[in-house]
Amino acid sequence: MSYRKLGRTTSQRKALLRDLATDLIINERIETTEARAKELRAVIEKMITLGKRGDLHARRQAAAFIRKEVANSETGQDALQKLFSDIAPRYQDRQGGYTRIMKLGPRRGDGAPMVIIELV
């Protein structure tokens, strides 16, 4: 199979990736395990590509996946609006490769390999 199960059932895995994708859109940089980051990379690339398309169908597809969380409390902008108005225009000239994964040390406690995933 071409994906990682991350020790979860299908619904738990989808919920985890939705949460991580929403957090990455809001914060533009998160710290997580290497396996989660590699799975998240594929999801977030698709979301940014939808944002670049920018039509109504792309917006609805992204809205079905991204959680409805406030990205900026001062302006009241939510994660979906941030994706389509702030993040996607940045990558208009770039064909993929919107994220960077930088390795950190192992996590204290269980030794899981930790990384920082961020938008380029």
Swiss-Prot record:
The keyword Disulfide bond does not apply. InterPro entries: Ribosomal_bL17, Ribosomal_bL17_CS, Ribosomal_bL17_sf. HAMAP family: Ribosomal_bL17. Part of the 50S ribosomal subunit. Contacts protein L32. Gene3D superfamilies: Ribosomal protein L17. Belongs to the bacterial ribosomal protein bL17 family. One of its GO terms (molecular function) is structural constituent of ribosome. PROSITE patterns: RIBOSOMAL_L17. One of its GO terms (biological process) is translation. One of its GO terms (cellular component) is cytosolic large ribosomal subunit. This is Large ribosomal subunit protein bL17. The gene is rplQ. The keyword Ion transport does not apply. Keywords: Ribonucleoprotein, Ribosomal protein. Pfam families: Ribosomal_L17. It comes from Geobacillus stearothermophilus (Bacillus stearothermophilus). Signal peptide: none annotated.
